[in-house]
Amino acid sequence: MIGFSNDADILKYEPMLFGELHLPWQVLAAATDGTLSGTTFSAAGADFVIAQVLAGGVVYMRSGDGSLDGVYEIVSVDSATELTVSVIRSDSDDDPISPPASDDISYRISTFGPQASEAAFQLTEYFGIRPGNPASDIDVENVLDTQALRRASVFAVISSIYAMLAGKSKDENFWNKSLYYQRLFERARERCRFSVDAGSDGLADVTKSGASGKLVRD
């Protein structure tokens, strides 16, 4: 499964999508036995590895006394029962930021991984690289810098989620949000410019531009 963005990227724009607007059929793990100390979140009855929880994911946590109630970034999966979590960071290379310590935590880890995978496929199709274009001699692993694609992917994912929510509730606000993020996606895709290592030598051989969707030899 390919992907240019993750759930933590979406969290920066729309935290509500991991709260009351989460998709119940895309919950990876949920229970009521969580404990949080510093940046270490533990749940004795969990198996985060089998649940396929990944770094870059998002966990919603609420303590029994209500002192903790929010969504946080998953920095790493340290064992089957332990995660390193953080208040959302501006840069994934920054040190984790501790949420308020608490116990008796109800938690839920939901994902938009399937939507991110679909967005990535559509982007590779648009830019003419595999897997979107199976006939291409350039694979997604040959892309050297994916930051521009990440931004476009985030907007595409959020737009698709709000379209799905609008279809279920007929809420005009959801439709408006979907259209808003669709416009952001189209602009971000048009501005995309990234390098491709077509020769597998670690050097940029080709530049892709969203304005044309065509290859430009360097």
Predicted segments, located by residue:
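Short, surface-exposed, charged amphipathic helix/loop patches that serve as local interaction elements
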Residues: 140-148, 152, 161-165
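Short amphipathic alpha-helical segments and their helix-coil junctions
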Residues: 112-147
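Alpha-helix boundary/N-cap detector
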Residues: 107-114, 118, 148, 152, ...
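Long alpha-helical scaffolds
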Residues: 33-34, 119, 159, 185
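Surface-exposed interaction regions enriched in Ser/Thr/Asp/Glu
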Residues: 54-55, 90-117, 121, 125
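Short loop/turn elements at secondary-structure junctions
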Residues: 1-28, 155, 159-218
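Residue-level marker of positions within ordered structural domains that often coincide
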Residues: 79, 124, 162
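Autoprocessing Asn-cyclization modules and mimics
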Residues: 4-94
